[in-house]
UniProtKB/Swiss-Prot annotation:
It is an enzyme of class 3 (hydrolase). The keyword Transferase does not apply. The gene is rnpA. The keyword Glycoprotein does not apply. Consists of a catalytic RNA component (M1 or rnpB) and a protein subunit. RNaseP catalyzes the removal of the 5'-leader sequence from pre-tRNA to produce the mature 5'-terminus. It can also cleave other RNA substrates such as 4.5S RNA. The protein component plays an auxiliary but essential role in vivo by binding to the 5'-leader sequence and broadening the substrate specificity of the ribozyme. It catalyses: Endonucleolytic cleavage of RNA, removing 5'-extranucleotides from tRNA precursor. This is Ribonuclease P protein component. Its EC number is 3.1.26.5.
Length: 122
């Protein structure tokens, strides 16, 4: 049975881990959100989130966005390549309702899966 947990080892925790992804990322983006990715040497993908107060003033809005991102990652983690992912929230993300937001995330994850397969074949 496949475990669909989101344990500590699946998270980017230190500034150095985030910096590694920001240096030379693969990008998939929409006007409201960007997912950056970079290959890691581990046997599993990891996730980091950046949701600035500049874009979402209220804590409960930032928490909603982070919760939806974590849930999306948790459900797709076994389909994703072994990359470190950083989700960057942009202006206008707070206006999206939950079903729209999860649909956008799903499209971006699929784009990263395709990009990873393409980079492996090269």
């Amino acid at each position: 049975m496949i475990k669909l947990n989101f344990s500590r080892e699946l998270r980017l925790l230190t500034p150095a881990q985030f910096k590694y992804v920001f240096e030379q990322p693969l990008r998939a983006s929409t006007p409201e959100i960007t997912i950056l990715a970079r290959r890691n040497d581990l046997q599993y993908p990891r996730l980091g989130l950046t949701v600035a107060k500049k874009h979402l003033k209220r804590a409960h809005e930032r928490n909603r966005v982070k919760r939806l991102c974590r849930e999306s990652f948790r459900l797709l983690q076994h389909e994703l390549p072994n990359y470190d992912f950083v989700i960057v929230a942009k202006h206008g993300i707070g206006k999206l309702d939950n079903p729209t937001f999860t649909a956008i995330l799903s499209k971006l994850w699929q784009r990263h899966i395709r990009l990873a397969k393409k980079s492996l074949s090269n």
